[in-house]
């Protein structure tokens, strides 16, 4: 989690954006995030848009994939069938 927080700070995310970003990574919907943070869904959508803009990533899937990429690197030997 520290590595993720450092990356959020590197991107210049505000504290609120960091909280939303972490919930996005955990797979919560905008509606669920709004309920958890006791705010409007529109606010969460705006924060998500700011997160994607600051990170230079295009949407939720690319945002999540950015963090998963290091874990999903497959050795060529592991990728061969059977």
Predicted segments, located by residue:
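Hydrophobic residues on short alpha-helical segments
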Residues: 21-25, 52, 64
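Basic, Lys/Arg-enriched C-terminal extension of HTH/homeodomain DNA-binding domains
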Residues: 53-82
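DNA major-groove recognition helices of helix-turn-helix
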Residues: 44, 51
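Positions in alpha-helical segments
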Residues: 6, 49-50
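Helix-turn-helix DNA-binding segment
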Residues: 3-43, 69-71, 75-78
